[in-house]
Structure formats: C-alpha cells, structure tokens
Amino acid sequence: ADIVLLPGRAAFLPKTSTIVCSDIHLGKAATFRHAGMPIPEGSEQHDLKRLVNLIDVHKARRLLITGDLFHARSGCTPQVLEEFSKFCKQVQSSTSTDVVLVLGNHERSLGKKFQPYEIGISRCEQEIIEPPFHFVHDQTKHSNVQTGSFTIAGHVHPTITIKGTGRDRLTCRCFVTTGTTLTLPAFGSFTGGYNTQPPSRTR
C-alpha cells in the first residue's frame, strides 16, 4: 500500500484517502499560560488551518490522528475545545471528512474533561488495525504486532540535525521509517523534538 510523506508533517494514504498526523498538542500554549508563562496565542489556530489546507489539497475523506491531539487538562480550555469543534464541523461539512483519533498518553491524562464525541471526533480507539496498517500512538507499547503489518505511530517527535560547514547546524523535524514502522513528526507548531540517531536499517 502506498504512503505519501508530506512536507506538512503528515502522511497521505491514497487508497483510503486518509491524512495521518500525530502529536498536535492543542492547548499546550494555554497550559503554559496557566502556569504563568507569557506564551502568545495563535498556535492552535495556525495548526488547524494547516490541517484544513492538507485535507483540501488531497481531498481527504478521513483525518486520522495517532495520539496527543491535546496536551494537558489545564490547556483544554473552552476556547481550545470550541476551536477544535469548529474545525471538525468545517471539514465534515465542506469535504465530508471524518476525524478519527487513536488515544495517546496525553489524552489518557485528561480524565472526564475529554469527551471526544462531543467535540466532533467520529471514532476514538486505543489502536486501529486496517491491514496492512496498524495505527498506534507509541509503538513500543504494542509488541504483539501481526506478521506482515506496518505500524504507523507518533509519540517520539523525531528530529534530525544537519551539520554544515564550520559550526552551522540545522535541526529539522523528520519521519523515521524501518521496514515495518513509520514514526511521524510532531504536527503541532508548539512542540519540542527528540534528535534521532537512526541505526543502519533506518531511514
């Protein structure tokens, strides 16, 4: 099955017309503001607009988020939840796009404050198996993978540092793939990254 890696930090599966992304971390800026840090607003709106653009360009019928859609309980403010709900209504009405979520570790920490079906998510699972694909958040938590399956996950926020001449360095978000797995970069603009040191059979 084909997987198209997109420069917008997401992947596209043409056969099922699915955009796959991970680690948006909506509400992270609000979480920091709640803790007294002077973080400007706007990152959530920017990321949701990027998603709308990807869906429009590829005419995707489904958006599948492999975990950590939201960041923390204190960041799930009425404004953040309303913005995401409006996003879901927009893509469902304009392109008939369903929004599907695989639960991440951050969703599990939200408790009763997280009501996915009340904000426009059409399906919410611990993992989704659609042979040959196996969608999870953290692939290290799912060891019983069927033979021949290909795991698509997030959680790690992979980055790579490119060294230039002198002391020049550029750190970029990246996809990491082996023969049986694909780790997606963090989609959210206001997220950190983990610098990968890929082994020989990893790209």
Explain the meaning of each model-derived region:
Residues A1-T66, F70-R203:
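Extended recognition/assembly regions associated with phosphoester-bond processing machinery
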